[in-house]
Curated annotation (Swiss-Prot):
Function comment: Involved in mRNA degradation. Catalyzes the phosphorolysis of single-stranded polyribonucleotides processively in the 3'- to 5'-direction.
Subcellular location, record wording: Cytoplasm
Signal peptide per UniProt: none
UniProt-recorded name of the protein: Polyribonucleotide nucleotidyltransferase
InterPro entries, A to Z: ExoRNase_PH_dom1, ExoRNase_PH_dom2_sf, GPSI/PNP, KH_dom, KH_dom_type_1, KH_dom_type_1_sf, NA-bd_OB-fold, PNPase
S1 motif domain mapped to chain residues: 658-730
Superkingdom of origin organism: Bacteria
Region (Disordered): 407-427, 727-913
Lineage: Bacteria, Bacillati, Actinomycetota, Actinomycetes, Bifidobacteriales
GO cellular component, as recorded: cytosol
Major site of localization recorded for this protein: cytoplasm
Length: 913
């Protein structure tokens, strides 16, 4: 089977020392039923399919050209699966919407404005190199697909992104190269009859690292002359790409179709309206205030409608009313433009370079972190700044380029700003575009993450609109950020420039306007927005209704904008000349660092530790992969407290004997309470010490005095060689814990004879000494604890089985090499209910003797193979024969046993005749 005929052309972009890039246009393989379909490739690893399709019939009720541009970002293009719940692409991202605007703005003026057939351009991103941006590729692909679609299109138009890197303008720069860009500019244009390139669209801004590159490394500053040079540098690249599109049109274009055009009005109707309303409109268009002017114009229009009610009866009412409105609007346009071109006279009486009245205020909204109101004439912008932790920075699921940003600028323009009603809710494309432009203007002067570790959200509320709300947003944002305490490197201001062109006395002239009104924007040829500091430009945007504007006209407009920018900066500096003190309601963020290997300890299992710190202190904590810790709280006190805790975990201080702590009870047991001294460090406050909190009286349970969560003042009594900490109540630190007498006191307690001689304690073989001779005052009268409740795991050296109620840090101590007892022999001495069952075993395994198997305590000799006086080795369990601590363990074990002791008569003497 014979395949489709594929036709392709190439444009080679030579960047000198930065290498070459190849842009290839291919048609014939994909989307064969679209009017025009082109696959555009950049270096064969980024691919975008562009299709252009027109509706078969016109939309007669439309009074505008219905062009739609859509960008479809396919996540598979970057090897990703969409992160949404349904795992498929949904609404377009902000990046896709901005790409749509870049494509729409240069294409729209090249269609007949009286065309009423729907035209849709769809850009599908099929593959993208993660080091490349796709927006400019899509712009060129859109022009190419429209060129071969057979539509009435006065193309081609081409676009190029240039980056000023190390003093050279580089076309189609990679993301990695753009890190060192001082300035970036996207320029779209078309080749005109004289071979020059007319500029149709500009989107530009200083690089995010521009300040560092300019003032620390001495790179070129992007002032007006440098930016004008960038416009000239773009022309050769635009021409090369336009030539490739012309070549593609020659070999693949369809024949241009005939489309019905719908004139907006008839010449006769326009002449009649001019005759009726010219004088009145001339006067109305001299009213400076917007709303009174609009009211007067509406009255004139109604008068014209009444006069023409009986005229032009060959039109139906709807058609007549639509053409009347179009002709009336065109008459206003001609009056405004003629006065500017011939008299340098503007609607509100200003000169061409004059700026409207300016005012600026800060701190007008209570409790917010920063606020400001900037007003230029009737354009009024409220700026509000919010600061938060860096973890609140926006995550971007982009195909390429940055995946997050810490400065987020949102622009909103409600319908009441123009005195109208309308939809309120999610942002429209225009609002997203204006927010992105204001963001681009301010990013170069923001402090670095290290200098100011905050995520910043800036909202610009256009609460009054009469021209250039986007540049008003830049000014209001500068004021608001400074009021919030953000240490901007320099204040930024913005101004909107306009253009009116036409023939006067047989000569085509251009008049550039400073600070345009809404009506001048609507009736003019250009909206040229310029933002920057006093020394260089930070953002540019150009929209035009013309096929293109000469570069020298734009260069002159840049110089005119610089004058206006300086005037606005003076007003800003008078209002606030530097960053203010941060609001008391703004979070205070401090930083610390922990070793990477300690990050897990700070976070804890399943975030237990970090969540506990946040709960206890009220601070917010974020930890980055390199160990940098950001801690935030209102006022800063909680943040300092959290920092101290984190530092203690990362560089722990081991409590020492004699140190006093206000600790929190984290667990209670039958033998005492565990008290948290520092994060991750607990100590045991024995029940004998807890009695001191009850005036020394006997207590039945620890919970009668201390409960979990209580705070208690304790003193460190001692730290053993394994780091286990015993605590005491201050003033009673010399008191011995009954459950754990020190090793050195055994002689006093046992008559000084050690394990080999018990006569003093028992009064001879098998006999206990008198109770009054014992150190434990009332031991025999105390209720006995079951061994299962004996939780003194921290203070003996005996290995033991894992039990479900063991504390986590108890388990960590089981790293000794002592052999473990068999589980079958590891029984509680009080488990006597199943004694008979155990005795019925018929195996020959040796068993331990149980206390119930002996008639008297003196039967120990049978169990241990002889008298205790036979020597230290003869009474040792062979399983622990090699353990040097075995004797100590047995001594402790006997003193803590839970077995009921048999009462022995004091007057009984077994040796009596």
């Amino acid at each position: 089977m014979e395949g489709p005929e594929i036709k392709a052309v190439e444009a080679v972009i030579d960047n000198g020392s930065f290498g070459k890039r190849t842009l290839r246009f291919e048609t014939g393989r994909l989307a064969q039923q679209a009017d025009g379909a082109v696959a555009a490739y950049l270096d064969d690893d980024s691919m975008i399919l562009s299709t252009t399709t027109a509706g078969s019939s016109p939309k007669e009720n439309y009074d505008f050209f219905p062009l739609t541009v859509d960008v479809e970002e396919k996540m598979y293009a970057a090897g990703k699966i969409p992160g949404s719940f349904f795992r498929r692409e949904g609404r377009p991202s902000s990046e896709a919407i901005l790409a749509c605007r870049i494509i729409d703005r240069p294409l729209r003026p090249l269609f007949p404005h009286t065309l009423r057939n729907e035209v849709q351009v769809v850009e599908t991103v099929l593959a993208v190199n993660p080091d490349d941006a796709y927006d400019v590729i899509a712009l060129n692909a859109a022009s190419a697909s429209t060129m071969i679609s057979g539509l009435p299109f006065e193309g081609p138009v081409s676009g190029v992104r240039l980056a000023l890197i190390d003093g050279q303008w580089v076309a189609f720069p990679r993301w990695s190269e753009r890190e060192r860009a001082v300035f970036e500019i996207v320029v779209a244009g078309r080749v005109i009859e004289n071979g020059d390139v007319a500029i149709a669209m500009i989107e530009a801004g200083a690089g995010k690292n521009a300040w560092h590159l300019i003032y620390d490394e001495g790179q070129t500053k992007p002032d007006e002359e440098v930016v004008a040079g960038g416009l000239e540098a773009a022309k050769p690249f635009i021409k090369v790409i336009c030539e490739a599109q012309d070549e593609l049109k020659k070999i693949a274009a369809k024949e241009t179709k005939e489309f019905q055009l719908f004139p907006e009005y008839t010449d006769e109707l326009y002449a009649r309206i001019d005759e009726i309303a010219h004088k009145d409109l001339d006067e109305a268009l001299s009213i400076a205030e917007k709303l009174p002017r609009q009211d007067r114009i509406h009255e004139i229009k109604e008068h014209v409608r009444e006069v023409l009610a009986d005229e032009f009866t060959d039109m139906d009412d709807a058609e007549k009313d639509k053409e009347l409105g179009n002709a009336f609007k065109e008459l206003q346009r001609q009056i405004v433009r003629r006065r500017i071109l011939t008299e340098d006279y503007r609607i509100d009486g200003r000169g061409l370079r004059d700026i409207r009245t300016l005012s600026a205020e800060v701190d007008i909204v209570p409790r917010v972190h920063g606020s400001a109101l900037f007003q230029r004439g009737e354009t009024q912008i409220l700026g509000v700044t919010t600061l938060n932790m860096l973890k609140m920075e926006q995550q971007i699921d982009a195909l390429s380029g940055p995946q997050s940003k810490r400065y987020m600028h949102n622009y909103e323009m409600p319908p009441y700003s123009t005195g109208e009603t309308g939809r309120v809710g999610s942002p429209k494309r225009r609002e997203i575009g204006h927010g992105a432009l204001a963001e681009k203007a301010l990013v170069p002067v923001l402090p670095s993450r290290e200098e100011f570790p905050y995520a910043i959200r800036q909202v610009s509320e256009a609460i009054g609109s009469n021209g250039s709300t986007s540049m008003g947003s830049v000014c209001a944002s500068t004021l608001s950020l400074l009021a919030a305490g953000v240490p901007l490197k320099a204040p930024v201001a913005g101004i909107a420039m306009g253009l009116v062109s036409g023939d006067v006395d047989g000569k085509h002239i251009f008049k550039t306007l400073t600070d345009i009104l809404g009506a001048e924007d609507a009736f003019g040829d250009m909206d040229f927005k310029v933002a920057g500091t006093s020394e260089f430009i930070t953002a540019l945007q150009l929209d035009t209704k013309l096929d293109g504007i000469p570069a020298d006209i734009l260069a002159a407009a840049l110089q005119q904008a610089k004058e206006a920018r300086a005037t606005i900066l003076e007003v800003i500096n008078e209002c606030i000349d530097g960053p203010a003190e941060m609001s008391e309601f703004a979070p205070r963020i401090i930083t610390t660092s922990v070793p990477v290997e300690k990050i897990g300890e700070v976070i804890g299992p399943k975030g237990k530790m970090i969540n506990q710190i946040q709960e206890d202190t009220g601070a917010e904590i974020a930890i980055e992969d390199d160990g940098t810790v950001f801690i935030s709280s209102e006022g800063g006190e909680a943040a300092e407290k959290a920092k101290a805790i984190i530092d203690q975990i990362a560089n722990p201080h081991v409590p020492e004997a004699g140190e006093t702590y206000n600790g929190k009870v984290v667990k209670t047991t039958s033998f005492g309470a565990f008290v948290n001294l520092t994060p991750g460090t607990d100590g045991l406050l024995h029940i004998s010490q807890i009695r001191n909190l009850a005036n020394g009286e006997r207590i039945d349970a620890v919970e009668d005095v201390l409960k979990e969560g209580d705070t208690v003042e304790v003193i460190v009594q001692g730290v053993d060689d394994r780091g286990k900490i015993s605590l005491a109540i201050p003033g009673f630190e010399d008191q011995e814990n009954n459950a754990r007498p020190s090793r050195g006191d055994r002689d006093d307690r046992r008559g000084g004879r050690g394990r080999g001689d018990r006569d003093d304690r028992r009064g001879g073989r098998g006999r206990r000494s008198e109770r009054d001779d014992r150190d434990f005052d009332d031991r025999d009268d105390r209720p006995r604890r079951r061994r299962s409740d004996d939780f003194e795991d921290d203070y003996d050296d005996r290995p033991r089985r894992r039990r479900s109620d063991d504390r986590d840090f108890d388990r960590d101590d089981r790293d000794d090499d002592r052999p473990r007892r068999r589980r079958s022999a590891d029984r509680d001495f009080d488990d006597r209910d199943d004694r008979d069952a155990r005795d019925s075993r018929d195996d020959d395994r040796p068993r331990r003797r149980r206390s119930s198997d002996r008639d008297d305590r003196g039967d120990r000799d049978d169990r241990r193979g002889g008298s205790r006086g036979r020597g230290r080795g003869s009474d040792r369990n062979p399983r622990y024969a090699t353990d040097d601590n075995y004797d100590d363990y047995r001594a402790d074990r006997e003193e803590r046993t839970e077995r009921p002791r048999r009462r022995v008569r004091r007057d009984f003497d077994p040796f009596e005749d």
